[in-house]
A protein has these predicted regions:
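Residue-level signal for inorganic ion chemistry
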Residues: 2, 52, 105-108
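Nucleotide phosphate-binding/pyrophosphate-handling subdomain across enzymes
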Residues: 3-51
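Short glycine-rich anion-binding loops that position phosphate/pyrophosphate groups of nucleotides
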Residues: 5, 33-35, 58-59, 109-111
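Alpha-helical elements of the RecA-like P-loop NTPase motor core of helicases
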Residues: 11, 39, 91, 113-114
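Active-site catalytic pocket residues across diverse enzymes, especially alpha/beta-hydrolases
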Residues: 17, 21, 73, 97, ...
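Generic beta-sheet signal
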Residues: 26-28, 101-107
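C-terminal helical cap/extension that packs against the catalytic core
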Residues: 42-102
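Glycine/aspartate-rich loop-and-adjacent alpha/beta segment that forms the canonical ThDP
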Residues: 108-127
Protein backbone atom coordinates (compact mmCIF):
# COMPACT_ATOMS: atom_id res chain seq x y z
CA UNK A 1 0.00 0.00 0.00
CA UNK A 2 1.40 3.31 -1.05
CA UNK A 3 0.36 6.91 -0.75
CA UNK A 4 0.29 8.15 -4.33
CA UNK A 5 -1.69 11.25 -5.15
CA UNK A 6 0.05 13.23 -7.88
CA UNK A 7 1.65 12.74 -11.26
CA UNK A 8 5.22 12.33 -9.99
CA UNK A 9 4.16 9.85 -7.32
CA UNK A 10 2.10 7.93 -9.92
CA UNK A 11 5.16 7.63 -12.16
CA UNK A 12 7.21 6.27 -9.24
CA UNK A 13 4.45 3.80 -8.36
CA UNK A 14 4.21 2.71 -12.02
CA UNK A 15 7.97 2.02 -12.03
CA UNK A 16 7.62 0.00 -8.83
CA UNK A 17 4.75 -2.03 -10.28
CA UNK A 18 6.75 -2.72 -13.46
CA UNK A 19 9.83 -3.76 -11.49
CA UNK A 20 8.24 -6.01 -8.86
CA UNK A 21 5.11 -7.35 -10.53
CA UNK A 22 6.10 -8.18 -14.11
CA UNK A 23 3.98 -11.05 -15.48
CA UNK A 24 1.52 -10.83 -12.59
CA UNK A 25 -2.21 -10.20 -12.82
CA UNK A 26 -2.66 -6.79 -11.18
CA UNK A 27 -5.93 -5.48 -9.78
CA UNK A 28 -6.17 -1.90 -8.60
CA UNK A 29 -8.43 -0.39 -6.00
CA UNK A 30 -8.23 3.33 -6.68
CA UNK A 31 -9.76 6.23 -4.76
CA UNK A 32 -8.72 9.87 -5.07
CA UNK A 33 -9.69 13.37 -4.07
CA UNK A 34 -11.21 15.54 -6.77
CA UNK A 35 -8.57 18.26 -6.41
CA UNK A 36 -5.74 15.88 -7.31
CA UNK A 37 -4.30 15.01 -10.72
CA UNK A 38 -6.60 12.01 -11.11
CA UNK A 39 -6.75 12.09 -14.93
CA UNK A 40 -2.95 11.98 -15.16
CA UNK A 41 -2.76 9.28 -12.46
CA UNK A 42 -5.28 7.18 -14.42
CA UNK A 43 -3.31 7.63 -17.64
CA UNK A 44 0.01 6.67 -16.01
CA UNK A 45 -1.21 3.71 -13.94
CA UNK A 46 -3.80 2.10 -16.25
CA UNK A 47 -1.41 0.27 -18.62
CA UNK A 48 -0.17 -2.01 -15.83
CA UNK A 49 -3.56 -3.22 -14.52
CA UNK A 50 -5.67 -6.16 -15.57
CA UNK A 51 -8.70 -4.68 -13.77
CA UNK A 52 -9.38 -1.41 -11.98
CA UNK A 53 -11.96 -0.93 -9.25
CA UNK A 54 -12.72 2.66 -8.29
CA UNK A 55 -14.02 3.80 -4.91
CA UNK A 56 -15.29 7.00 -3.35
CA UNK A 57 -13.02 7.90 -0.44
CA UNK A 58 -15.42 7.70 2.55
CA UNK A 59 -15.95 10.63 4.86
CA UNK A 60 -14.06 13.19 2.80
CA UNK A 61 -15.98 16.09 1.25
CA UNK A 62 -13.20 16.43 -1.37
CA UNK A 63 -13.59 12.82 -2.51
CA UNK A 64 -14.06 12.17 -6.21
CA UNK A 65 -16.99 9.82 -6.76
CA UNK A 66 -16.20 6.26 -7.79
CA UNK A 67 -18.38 6.71 -10.87
CA UNK A 68 -16.63 9.89 -12.04
CA UNK A 69 -13.25 8.26 -11.45
CA UNK A 70 -14.37 5.14 -13.37
CA UNK A 71 -15.48 7.30 -16.30
CA UNK A 72 -12.06 8.94 -16.34
CA UNK A 73 -10.17 5.65 -16.01
CA UNK A 74 -12.30 4.16 -18.83
CA UNK A 75 -10.53 6.52 -21.26
CA UNK A 76 -7.35 4.52 -20.59
CA UNK A 77 -8.53 1.04 -19.59
CA UNK A 78 -11.44 -1.16 -20.69
CA UNK A 79 -11.87 -3.20 -17.49
CA UNK A 80 -12.98 -0.69 -14.88
CA UNK A 81 -15.77 -0.93 -12.33
CA UNK A 82 -17.05 1.60 -9.80
CA UNK A 83 -17.66 -0.03 -6.41
CA UNK A 84 -20.45 1.15 -4.11
CA UNK A 85 -18.31 0.72 -0.98
CA UNK A 86 -14.82 -0.19 0.15
CA UNK A 87 -16.12 -3.59 1.24
CA UNK A 88 -17.50 -4.23 -2.23
CA UNK A 89 -14.20 -3.14 -3.81
CA UNK A 90 -12.23 -5.58 -1.66
CA UNK A 91 -14.72 -8.40 -2.36
CA UNK A 92 -14.57 -7.70 -6.10
CA UNK A 93 -10.78 -7.64 -6.07
CA UNK A 94 -10.69 -11.03 -4.33
CA UNK A 95 -13.13 -12.47 -6.88
CA UNK A 96 -10.99 -11.22 -9.77
CA UNK A 97 -7.72 -12.42 -8.25
CA UNK A 98 -6.05 -15.78 -8.40
CA UNK A 99 -3.37 -17.00 -6.00
CA UNK A 100 -0.58 -15.19 -7.87
CA UNK A 101 -2.41 -11.90 -8.39
CA UNK A 102 -1.43 -8.57 -6.90
CA UNK A 103 -4.13 -6.32 -5.45
CA UNK A 104 -2.87 -2.77 -5.17
CA UNK A 105 -4.84 -0.05 -3.38
CA UNK A 106 -3.62 3.48 -3.97
CA UNK A 107 -4.65 7.10 -4.12
CA UNK A 108 -5.94 8.93 -1.09
CA UNK A 109 -4.19 7.96 2.12
CA UNK A 110 -7.41 8.51 4.04
CA UNK A 111 -9.06 5.26 2.92
CA UNK A 112 -6.11 2.85 2.97
CA UNK A 113 -6.39 2.13 6.70
CA UNK A 114 -10.04 1.23 6.20
CA UNK A 115 -9.08 -1.13 3.36
CA UNK A 116 -6.62 -2.87 5.69
CA UNK A 117 -9.34 -3.27 8.35
CA UNK A 118 -11.72 -4.79 5.78
CA UNK A 119 -9.04 -7.25 4.62
CA UNK A 120 -8.31 -8.25 8.23
CA UNK A 121 -12.03 -8.89 8.85
CA UNK A 122 -12.28 -10.96 5.66
CA UNK A 123 -9.27 -13.05 6.67
CA UNK A 124 -10.86 -13.70 10.07
CA UNK A 125 -14.14 -14.80 8.44
CA UNK A 126 -12.34 -17.14 6.02
CA UNK A 127 -10.10 -18.70 8.68
Amino acid sequence: YKRQHNEDAARKLAQTVQFYFTNKKIIYIMGVLRDKEYEKIAEIMSPFADSIITVTTPGNPRALSALTLAETVAKYHNRVTAADSLEEAVEMSYLLADKDSVILAFGSLSYLGQIMDIIDKMKTKRA
